[in-house]
Design a protein with these regions (language model features):
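Charged, glycine-interspersed solvent-exposed loop segments at helix/strand-loop junctions
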Residues: 201, 205-304, 451-531, 535-550, ...
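Hydrophobic alpha-helical transmembrane signal-anchor segments
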Residues: 34-69, 77
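C-terminal long alpha-helix characteristic of the crotonase
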Residues: 262-263, 293-337, 444, 500-506, ...
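Active-site proximal loops enriched in glycine and acidic residues that flank catalytic Cys/His/Asp
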Residues: 342-345, 382-384, 412-414, 427, ...
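N-terminal Lys/Arg-rich, disordered targeting/topogenic segments
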Residues: 1-41
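Membrane-proximal juxtamembrane linkers immediately C-terminal to transmembrane helices
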Residues: 69-79, 332-333
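Cleft-lining beta-strand/loop regions that shape enzyme active-site pockets
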Residues: 80-201, 330-453
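Intrinsic disorder and flexible/low-complexity segments
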Residues: 333-338, 342-374, 491, 563-621
Length: 621
């Protein structure tokens, strides 16, 4: 892109060519024949095509070279690096250009949670890996993934190998993870953030009023906690939503402080006092309050390693390098498989394969797993805030049919709420992370009216004909009348009734109990276990162990991941679309605005009934 701009500037600076009058030529002597013009044009097309082909081959060879496994040997004395700034995802990335940065024309690593957990487990008994070094400025993992990887590092310590952490600056989540280390170090001129947890909601009502956009909200009266629609008709949190969010951040902060308290032997009361008084900002203050052990530069950390833990011949081993060095897991019988299916993203109607859950596409994957005789049990990793009620029900049906044939265990990620919980309900067991956002058993509809705003600001008007009184219902030009509103509410109430009944059936709970804990309320994983929406708290490995036990597979089984692959040009175009969005997200303020615009687009962009939870850790700090 930069080269193109420079080239355009150079061309612009050149003086305009002086027109030259052609010399008179005798008839029949012209050298500019049709054949030559056609040949030149054809040659230009061919050369241009070859240049593009070479460019794409270069890109794919770069990506391919990066993705080759087993090419870099592991040193005999290595220290495994966990770089918290590198992305770790729930599900394998679907696009063929994953890890390729078009701004720098280079590749960056992206790892899956399951592979990282497998690598840390392998490192326990790998004599070449002497310890773990935690570092990185930034955060490439969600809090739920942080918790699972942190637990794996805690287990790694049982091997007797060392774990140390060093950061220039500590964010709250970085410290939550790094507190697992035997020794924690900070840069002498770094900083420390310890402030507690807060959550913020953006409200659009004032903007909509100024624009003249009216929004009809369809929400059952009992769904008072279903707050996804509140930004469209309120200017601040409702009392119910405020209570819900306060409960969430309290539970989240409680998990952070209890974990740090245990790791650093500091009372929860003292940790809260530090946050209330902003006592820890400077490195010296972090040492004084026993959050870190010492201030060290990177070279001093290296010297410490070679003095106390390893020899000077050691080498760092990147996590992606170590994952690539591990042989594919081929142990266990190929005829006794535990399949991992990923349900990652917002739930939408139809078919597709990007960063959303398409109802028909996931349903087809579930059907394939159900009819595969080699698959004896299924773990579904759900990381979804919900979405389309219809798509959720399509997936639910296939999950129910699957559960009737073989054990199904849900592993909840960052969130498995609303529609995400809807599709989880039929499972034999539900495993939630302690900080999973789940529940949100409720429903709503939203119908924006933009006609008056378009006329006021742009002079656009609408007119038409119809055969019946309500033939133009839902087109967005006029608000719903009383009859139309009642008709829409019948559909909303029907979805809520079905949602609560299938949860009662799937979780073996009285309907009255489900109605009491539903109302659209969001629960943390620990709370979900207490009220019966989850069976236990744990990660994906816990879910796998439960699935193995329910299928009575013993030790002779194999883990397989069932993925939806996209091939050819469609995959490339989807990838480029994802890349463009990621560039926006790379700037925090722009990223937050983009997230808010995406929410508006989801609901205002098309009329419908939704089972959706508005919260994610991107809005919780």
């Amino acid at each position: 892109m930069e080269e193109n701009k420079n080239l355009e500037a150079q061309v612009a600076e050149q003086p305009a060519a002086t027109p030259v009058q052609p010399k008179a030529k005798k008839a029949g002597k012209s050298k500019l024949t049709f054949g030559k013009v056609f040949g030149a044009a054809l040659l230009a097309v061919v050369v241009g095509g070859l240049v593009k082909l070479v460019l794409w081959m270069g890109i794919f060879s770069t990506v391919g070279a990066f993705s080759n496994t087993g090419t870099t040997p592991i040193p005999e004395e290595g220290v495994l690096k966990i770089n918290l700034s590198l992305p770790v995802t729930d599900a394998p990335l679907k696009d063929p250009l994953a890890g390729f940065d078009f701004t720098t024309m280079s590749t960056t690593s992206s790892m899956t949670l399951y592979n990282v957990l497998q690598a840390i487990d392998a490192a326990k008994s790998d004599d070449r890996i002497k310890g773990i070094y935690i570092m990185g400025e930034g955060l490439g993992m969600t809090p739920t993934i942080l918790e699972e990887v942190r637990a794996a590092v805690e287990d790694f310590k049982q091997s007797g190998k060392f774990v140390i952490a060093h950061h220039d600056t500590f964010s709250q989540w970085q410290y939550y993870f790094s507190s697992v280390a035997d020794k924690v170090f900070i840069h002498p001129e770094g900083s420390f953030s310890w402030t507690g947890v807060g959550a913020t909601t953006m409200f659009y009502t004032g903007l909509l009023d100024k624009l003249g956009v009216k929004v009809d909200i369809l929400r059952p009266t009992v769904c008072k906690y279903k707050s996804a629609v509140e930004p469209f008709f309120l200017k601040e949190m409702s009392p119910a939503n405020r209570a819900q969010m306060q409960s969430m951040v309290d539970a989240m902060w409680g998990e952070i402080t209890s974990t740090v308290s245990k790791a650093r032997n500091i009372s929860v009361e003292d940790l809260n006092a530090m946050a209330d008084n902003l006592s820890v900002v400077l490195p010296e203050e972090a040492i004084e309050h026993k959050l870190v052990d010492s201030m060290l530069y990177s070279d001093q950390v290296l010297k410490l390693l070679t003095t106390e833990y390893v020899s000077e011949d050691f080498s760092y081993v990147d996590m992606s390098q170590y994952i690539a060095s591990l042989k594919p897991d081929t142990k266990g019988s190929v005829t006794s498989q535990v399949a991992i299916v990923y349900a990652n993203g917002q739930i939408v109607d139809g078919e597709g394969n990007d960063d959303m859950i398409y109802g028909e596409t996931l349903a087809e994957t579930i059907r394939e797993v159900a009819t595969d005789d080699y698959v004896k049990a299924v773990v579904v990793r759900v990381n979804s805030p919900g979405g389309s009620a219809l798509a959720s029900d399509i997936i639910w049906r296939e999950m129910k049919l699957l559960q009737e044939k073989k054990p199904v265990v849900i592993s909840m990620g960052e969130y498995a709420a609303s529609g995400g919980y809807y599709i989880s309900a039929p499972a034999d067991a539900i495993v939630a992370d302690k900080m999973t956002l789940t529940g949100s058993i409720g429903v709503f509809g939203i119908m924006p009216t933009t006609g008056p705003a378009l006329e006021k600001h742009l002079g656009i008007t609408f007119d038409g004909v119809k055969t019946n009184a309500h033939s133009d219902m839902g087109q967005g030009f006029e608000s719903l009348d009383a009859t139309e509103y009642k008709a829409m509410m019948r559909g909303v109430d029907r979805v809520y009734e079905r949602f609560t009944s299938l949860v009662a059936e799937g979780r073996n709970l009285p309907v009255e109990k489900v109605l009491d804990i539903a109302e659209g309320r969001v629960w943390m994983g620990t709370q979900a276990q207490q009220i019966g929406l989850a069976d236990t708290c744990g990660g994906i490995k816990t879910a796998i162990a439960i699935a193995v036990d329910k299928a009575a597979l013993g030790e002779d089984y194999r883990i397989v991941e069932r993925l939806d692959d996209v091939e050819g040009l469609a995959a490339i175009l989807q990838s480029l679309n994802v890349k463009a969005r990621s560039l926006v997200r790379s700037f925090s303020d722009m990223g937050r605005m983009q997230e808010e615009l995406t929410k508006i687009e989801q609901f205002v962009g098309e009329n419908g009934i939704y089972t959706y939870c508005p919260y994610a850790y991107t809005s919780v700090r």
